[in-house]
C-alpha cells in the first residue's frame, strides 16, 4: 500500500481538474480571503497540488487574533480528527507487513479488549474499529479522554460496559474511542506506540518535518496557529485564542499538528 495517495487527502487541496486551461488564481485568492471573513475564522492556509507538485499556496488571516502574525503557507495547524487518516494508514501498513489482517478479530491481538456484548467482543474486526459502526452512539465515551489524564487502556476498559445504542454494524456512530483502540492495536502488533510508529513509517519517509504528534513539540516551531474559542460557546461572542491541550489519551483519534 502506497502512503502518498492516502496522505494526499490530508492536505488542504483544491483539484485543478483535468482541463488544460489555466485556472483563475485571482478568483480563487478572492474566494479564499472571503471565506475567512464569511465563516468568521482566525486564519486559513490553502495549497493546490497537481500531479504531486505544489503549484500554488497562500495563507490568510492570523495565527492568533490577539496578535499581528499572519498565517503563511507553512503555518502549522492542529488537524484534530484528520489524525484518524494517519491511524488508518498505519493499520494498512501493518496489513501490508503481514502483521495483521483487516478481518482479524481485535481480540486476536488485544485479548483484553472488551465491549458490553460478548458476541461483539468476539467478532469485532480490525476494520470495524475504523468504520464507526461499533454500535455506540456518536461521541460515546469522549468525556473519558477529554481533559483527563487516563491512559488509553484505562479509557477503553472504563468504557467497556457502556451499553450499545445500536446493533453491531447496523448504524453509523462516530467513535473516537474505536480509533483509540486502533492506536492500542498498532502498539500491540508493532511493539511501538502510535506516535512512534506514525513518525517512523509515515512522517519521516514523506519528509513531513513540520508535522508533530506531540503537542509539547510545538515549542520547537514558529508559525503555529493557535486554536480559538468563543466565551460560553456563544456564536455572537468574540473569539479568543487558547493554549493547546495535551490529549495523549486520544492518540489515534486526534493529536497531530501539521
Label every PLM stretch briefly.
Residues 30, 88-89, 104, 180, ...:
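A generic alpha-helix surface/boundary motif
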Residues 23-77, 99-101, 108, 151-153, ...:
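Short, conserved catalytic-motif segment at the N-terminal edge
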Residues 1-7:
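Bacterial N-terminal signal peptides that target proteins for export
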Residues 8-17:
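Bacterial N-terminal signal peptides
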Residues 38-45, 66-129, 164-177, 251-254:
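Short active-site loop at a secondary-structure junction
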Residues 64, 118-258:
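Short, surface-exposed loop or secondary-structure junction motifs
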Amino acid at each position: 500500500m502506497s502512503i502518498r495517495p492516502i496522505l494526499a487527502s490530508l492536505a488542504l487541496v483544491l483539484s485543478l481538474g483535468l482541463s488544460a486551461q489555466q485556472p483563475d488564481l485571482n478568483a480563487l485568492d478572492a474566494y479564499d480571503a472571503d471565506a475567512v471573513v464569511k465563516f468568521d475564522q482566525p486564519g486559513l492556509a490553502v495549497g493546490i497540488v497537481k500531479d504531486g507538485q505544489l503549484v500554488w499556496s497562500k495563507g490568510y488571516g492570523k495565527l492568533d487574533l490577539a496578535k499581528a502574525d499572519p498565517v503563511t503557507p507553512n503555518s502549522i495547524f492542529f488537524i484534530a480528527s484528520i489524525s484518524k487518516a494517519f491511524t488508518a494508514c498505519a493499520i494498512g501498513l501493518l496489513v501490508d507487513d503481514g502483521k495483521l489482517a483487516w478481518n482479524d478479530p481485535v481480540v486476536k491481538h488485544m485479548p483484553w479488549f472488551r465491549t458490553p456484548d460478548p458476541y461483539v467482543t468476539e467478532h469485532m474486526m480490525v476494520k470495524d474499529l475504523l468504520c464507526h459502526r461499533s454500535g455506540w452512539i456518536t461521541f460515546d465515551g469522549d468525556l473519558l479522554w477529554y481533559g483527563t489524564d487516563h491512559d488509553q487502556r484505562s479509557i477503553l476498559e472504563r468504557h467497556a460496559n457502556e451499553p450499545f445504542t445500536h446493533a453491531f454494524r447496523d448504524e453509523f456512530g462516530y467513535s473516537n474511542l474505536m480509533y483509540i483502540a486502533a492506536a492500542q492495536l498498532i502498539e500491540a502488533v508493532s511493539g511501538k506506540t502510535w506516535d512512534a510508529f506514525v513518525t517512523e513509517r509515515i512522517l519521516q519517509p514523506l519528509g513531513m518535518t513540520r508535522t508533530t504528534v506531540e503537542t509539547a513539540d510545538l515549542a520547537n516551531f514558529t508559525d503555529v496557529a493557535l486554536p480559538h474559542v468563543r466565551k460560553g460557546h456563544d456564536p455572537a461572542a468574540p473569539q479568543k485564542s487558547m493554549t493547546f491541550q495535551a490529549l495523549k489519551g486520544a492518540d489515534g483519534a486526534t493529536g497531530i499538528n501539521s
